[in-house]
Amino acid sequence: MPRLVLSLFAYLFCSTLLQAQAWQPFGVRQLGFTFDVPPGFVLTQHEDQGAAFQGPRNAFLAVWGARLGKASFRAEIEHRMMEDEKAGWQLSYRRVTPKWASYSGVKNGEIRYVRAIKVCNDRAALFTINYSRFEKTPYDPIVVRMVRSLKAEGC
């Protein structure tokens, strides 16, 4: 019995370690940001400014950089929130600061979480993830790690 418990512990420890290492770095150097893509997400589209990934059970992740132009960071985020509301997303959380912003909402049984950071003066880096609201609990730590991984780099 002790061997079984020890074997199970070793398996779980190694599985957790492998899963932690399965995050893939992604970045757009010319736009000045890096980001970690969670395990299980497969690249479906890649362009100069960002990429889209398909995740388990139809989860969708997009990460990209944007030049702000004449718009301020706050104005850009408020515009995105307004567009999402027009598209039917019921926003339940909003936080906009001078250097970062987050908001989330629900629509048709899905959760959308958006995170943006200001990078390199006139640019922003953003990610959006959509997933089933029935998977909120397992996605919470994934979203937290993605938020922490979105960083300015190479300005």
Residue ranges, per PLM feature:
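Positively charged n-region of N-terminal signal peptides that target proteins for export
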Residues: 1-4
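Bacterial N-terminal signal peptides
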Residues: 7-16
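General secretory precursor processing signal
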Residues: 17-18, 123
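Short, solvent-exposed mixed-charge patches
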Residues: 21, 154-155
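N-terminal "mature-domain start" segment
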Residues: 21-44
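Conserved polar/disulfide-associated segments of primarily extracytoplasmic proteins
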Residues: 43-141
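C-terminal partner/receptor-binding element of secreted or periplasmic proteins
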Residues: 137-149, 155
